[in-house]
Regions:
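Active-site anion-handling motifs in enzyme catalytic cores
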Residues: 1-368
Length: 368
């Protein structure tokens, strides 16, 4: 069966890259001809610009030009740097993309990639705070009549969507044959819109087991026992907590992002190095959804620091659903409890089974 998936697959973000890989790889393991639609509208295509303003305060004659000239050397270095190269290499080697690149929903509608079944997802494709959450393409608006349209683990990344977007979102969701979402909050949003039958499933990274992930990870040379920090928010409490844990246990402090307190920083590395870092950490401290997901996959001890923003819905939902409420910390002074994995794995396996059953149900309709 021909299957096409659409997601934000090439945005230089570790979670986005790995979830895109996971879904298409799982579908291929089931024996299907699955590809990711190479969908790159303008708003998903300008991650390493050479010219542009990061601060509107500089948007004045002459100052604008001076600002861009001052930023140009650093931007050239980033565009030609290791991090971009690592992500580009991952996309080229591990993501089976359609031969054609599409740049708009109209482009897709005029010449849609052929498939029996289309999956939209996973990750934050329906986050209305981002342009993709308002893009009809991520609701499979382009899919031809007669094909099966389904979402897989799509995320709104919030507890509710803005009132002004509800009519459009409802109309677009109504065009799907099957709806699955990643969070219980997403299922509640769909239900409040008057659309029944949304299924909550796990992020696609859970469709592959730890051995499958370990088989593609990139080894990190010359490591010592370490605690891994992944801090999106530059939270000083997280850094202090992680440094104290490292000192108390005689570990090094490794960080996925730049951090003045770390012993080694891996900001310029790509998704495959990230997998190895989580896999071999003694402990993981993060405020990242996918760092949390891979900590579970690799059976690591971990804590998650709360994020004071809408996006925190993702981590809360995952942890609460597995009975890991105590792993979500509000401050560095919170207690850190050891995770009892035999009990957690039973719940996780049940949720993954539901997720796989949902996919089978969608595909069974595509066979008719």
């Amino acid at each position: 069966m021909k299957i096409k998936t659409i997601t934000c697959h090439d945005v230089y973000n570790v979670g986005a890259s790995l979830q895109a890989y996971a879904l298409v790889t799982y579908l291929r393991k089931l024996g299907h001809d699955a590809q990711i639609i190479d969908y790159k509208p303008d708003y998903l295509s300008n991650h390493y610009p050479l010219w542009g303003l990061g601060n509107p305060a500089y948007d004045k004659p002459v100052i604008r030009e001076l600002y861009n000239l001052a930023k140009l050397p650093g931007r050239l270095k980033a565009r030609n740097g290791k991090r971009k190269a690592e992500y580009d290499r991952f996309t080229a080697e591990f993501l089976p993309l359609t031969p054609r690149r599409y740049t708009s929903n109209d482009d897709l509608k005029q010449n849609p990639p052929e498939a029996d079944v289309y999956f939209a997802g996973s990750d934050q494709i329906w986050n209305c705070f981002f342009p993709n959450g308002k893009d009809p393409a991520f609701y499979l608006d382009f899919a031809p009549a007669g094909s099966v349209r389904a979402s897989y683990a799509a995320s709104f990344a919030m507890d509710d969507i803005p009132e002004e977007w509800k009519p459009d979102v409802k109309r677009r969701l109504s065009g799907l044959d099957h709806i699955s979402v990643r969070e219980s909050s997403g299922a509640a949003i769909v239900e409040r819109l008057g659309i029944p039958g949304a299924v909550q499933v796990m992020d696609p990274v859970f469709l592959l087991d730890s051995e499958a992930w370990a088989s593609i990870e990139k080894p990190v040379p010359n490591t010592e026992p370490y605690v891994l920090l992944y801090d999106f928010d530059r939270n000083p409490e997280m850094v202090r907590f992680t440094r104290r844990m490292a000192e108390e246990n005689g570990w090094k402090l490794y960080s996925v992002l730049s951090c003045g307190e770390c012993d080694r920083c891996f900001e310029q590395d790509g998704p495959l190095t990230f997998l190895n870092l989580v896999h071999h950490a003694q402990f993981v401290v993060s405020n990242s959804f996918h760092a949390t997901a891979f900590s579970l996959i690799f059976r690591k001890q971990f804590v998650v620091f709360n994020r004071q923003e809408h996006i925190n819905t993702r981590m809360r939902d995952l942890l609460y659903g597995l009975g890991l409420r105590d792993c979500l910390m509000d401050s560095a002074g919170s207690d850190c409890l050891r995770i009892d994995y035999p009990q957690i794995l039973e719940r996780l396996d049940e949720k993954v089974s539901v997720s796989k059953a949902y996919i089978e149900n969608v595909l069974s309709e595509g066979k008719r």
